[in-house]
Structure formats: C-alpha cells, structure tokens
C-alpha cells in the first residue's frame, strides 16, 4: 500500500493497509489542520476503517481526500503499490 499527501510528503510504501493508514493519520495529525479536518481524517482513516478503505481501493483503485493548509488544497491518497495513482 502507498500513502501520500501531495506537495507535503513523498509516497510511502507499506506491506499492510493498517500500517499505511496509521502512518498517514500520524502525518496528517502533525500538520496545522483545523479541528474539523483532524476529526474528519481521524474518522476516515481510523483503525476501524481498514475494511471500508480496502473495499474502495479494490473497487476504485485508490482513496482520495483533500487536506487544506490555509487555502491550499493537498490531495491525500491511498493506493496499491505498483498502481500509479491518477494525477
């Protein structure tokens, strides 16, 4: 599994989806995001979301969300290794 926050982090590869989501959530929590965004990402990528996220990756090839730092959006992506995420 690969996770990245475009413009902030390089793609990081993990053997297991739970590890990837945990690392992504830690990276998001380190950013100066508003409380609403942090709560959204906590819910979206929490440990209980592994099955749901995995299903979406199988169905759609990736999962995307947006993180806003000020007025600047950054795409947050989770996708399978070997699958180049669409830009």
Please report, for each region that a protein language model flagged, where it lies by residue:
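Short aromatic-glycine-(Arg/Gly/Cys) micro-motifs in beta-strand/loop hairpins
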Residues: 1-9
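Generic structural motif
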Residues: 8, 17, 81-83
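Well-ordered beta-strand positions in beta-sheet-rich domains
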Residues: 11-13
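A short, charged, amphipathic alpha-helix used as a generic interaction element across diverse proteins
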Residues: 15-37
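Short, mixed-charge low-complexity intrinsically disordered segments
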Residues: 30-87
């Amino acid at each position: 599994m690969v996770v990245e926050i475009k413009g902030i982090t390089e793609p990081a590869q993990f053997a297991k989806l739970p590890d990837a989501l945990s690392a992504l959530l830690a990276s998001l929590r380190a950013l100066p995001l508003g409380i609403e965004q942090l709560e959204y990402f906590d819910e979206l990528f929490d440990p209980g979301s592994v099955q749901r996220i995995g299903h979406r990756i199988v169905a759609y090839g990736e999962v995307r969300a947006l993180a806003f730092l000020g007025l600047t959006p950054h795409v947050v992506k989770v996708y399978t290794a070997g699958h180049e995420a669409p830009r």
